[in-house]
Each structure stands twice: as C-alpha cells, then as structure tokens.
Amino acid sequence: LDSKNSLEDSVTAMESLIQQGVDGISVFPISTEQGSQLVKMANEAGIPVTIENFAMDGLDDPGDYIASVACEYDKIGEAAIKWIAEQDPEAKIFFCAGQEGAGVYEKYQEGVDRALEELGGDVKVVATLHADWLTDKAYNVTTDLINSGTEFNYIFANNDMMAQGCYNALKDAGKENIPIVSTGGSPDGFKMLQDGIEAANMTAPVSIQGVKTFMNLYNKVALGEDPAEKFTALPVIPVSADDTSSYIAWDDYAAAYKYLGENK
C-alpha cells in the first residue's frame, strides 16, 4: 500500500492491513518517528512487523520490530573518498554536496571527514559547495568554482542528478576529462557510467534492501526464525566505468538474492 509520504495515509494503510488480518507487515517509513508509530500499531494487533530504509535503534522506544535494513550514508561518503585516493593519492576533490539541514548530507560529510583523517592529508577536499540534489544548481556551483580558479582534479557528487550538472559544467569549460564519482547506483547512474559521464558510482542497491527486508519478514512469520542482527546496513559496492560487472540494478532481485547468499 502506498502511503504517498503522508503520515495520515500511512496510519490508514496500517489500519487496513490490521483489519485484513495479514500475517506480517513490512513498513517503509518516512521517518523513525513515523516508523515507531506504525510498529506500535502492529504490536497492539499482534502482527509481526519489519522496517526498511531507517535504523530504529536511535529511538528510546521504537516498538517491537523484527529488524531494520537501511543505507548508511556516512559509509558511502567514506567509500567515495577512499576510491578516489586509490586512483590518485594526492587528489584535489570538489565535493558537490546535497542540501544541508535534513541530515542526509551531514551523514555523508561524516564519512568524508573520516576518510580524509584516515588518509592523513595527501588527499584534500578543496571545496564543498551545496547543489541541494539539483542538476541545474550543480551546474552553477561547478561553473562558479571553475571560474574562481580553484584547482581540482576529481568531483564527488552527492547524487546522480548533481553528477550530470557537474559534467555539463565541465564539458562547457572544456574540462570533461575530470573524473566524477557519484552515489546511489540508480538506473540513470548506471547509464552515466556506460556513457563515461561518471568514473565510478558508490552503489547501495535498493534491491538488496528489499530482498533482505522480505527475508527478515518471511523467516519470522513462516519459519519462526529471528534474524542474526537487529540492523543490517546496505553494502556499499563501488562500480567503476571500466568494470560494471559488480553492478546490481535496483530491480534485479535475483542478483540481490544471490549477493546476500554469497555475503552472509
């Protein structure tokens, strides 16, 4: 049931599932607080419930849920900087960042900072500019940075839409040879790898998230088995334009299931 990112609709959907007497429920909340409310509704009805897209352990009382599966954005940021460092141990990186204030960019920044500290100073982020997840704004901030004379030889873009904007700006300035590293592994991102727009993508396949969430629910409801871990982080799988064989598409559930079987 699609709650359309609405708390009210999600409560209505949960009430409908409870009235139908389903054996188990998987919840994709829009916040941990909303997730906790829905979990507690399932608890009151005696229906097992599992969570995806958020780690719930930060709440004092999240309710009783089977497990949660979610992306850890700091690990993606860390992986991006380390991948760049492997290509160029003295890289000068422009971080085209997402929007401040919602917590997502901030987690990426934690990972970037952690990687830079671990690498010891030879790799540098020479500029961090916020393009707020938008292609046009990424074009503008990249163009402004080029015009400022700041030297950089790698771009870490916080998503594929911004990576496209960065590339457009580089191309207009005759600098399209500067590699761009992005995140997410979306279908658009995969095409950008194939087209040479991105040098690499730090993928975190949502198909793995969906399959792992289903496995958690099925194993509990059908087999009575609890998962070994209460929280599972999505793996960060670096995919380069030179070798896309490790890419797992967002809708390739067979590949996701195979990956989980091989990486227990």
Question: What are these model-derived regions, one by one?
Answer:
Residues 1-3, 94-95, 116-135:
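Short beta-strand elements in bilobed, periplasmic/extracellular small-molecule ligand-binding domains
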Residues 10, 67-93, 107, 137-139, ...:
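Hydrophobic alpha-helical segments within soluble ligand-binding/sensing domains
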Residues 11-15, 19, 23-44, 112, ...:
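Hydrophobic alpha-helical
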Residues 24, 29, 66-67, 92-101:
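Short beta-strand segments enriched in small/hydrophobic residues
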Residues 29-30, 54, 97, 159, ...:
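Short secondary-structure boundary segments
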Residues 32, 37-75, 186-194, 199, ...:
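Flexible loop/hinge segments that line or gate small-molecule binding clefts
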Residues 76-80, 103-123, 137, 141, ...:
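Short, solvent-exposed amphipathic alpha-helices that sit
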Residues 96, 100, 104, 115-119, ...:
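Hinge/cleft segment of the Venus flytrap/periplasmic-binding protein
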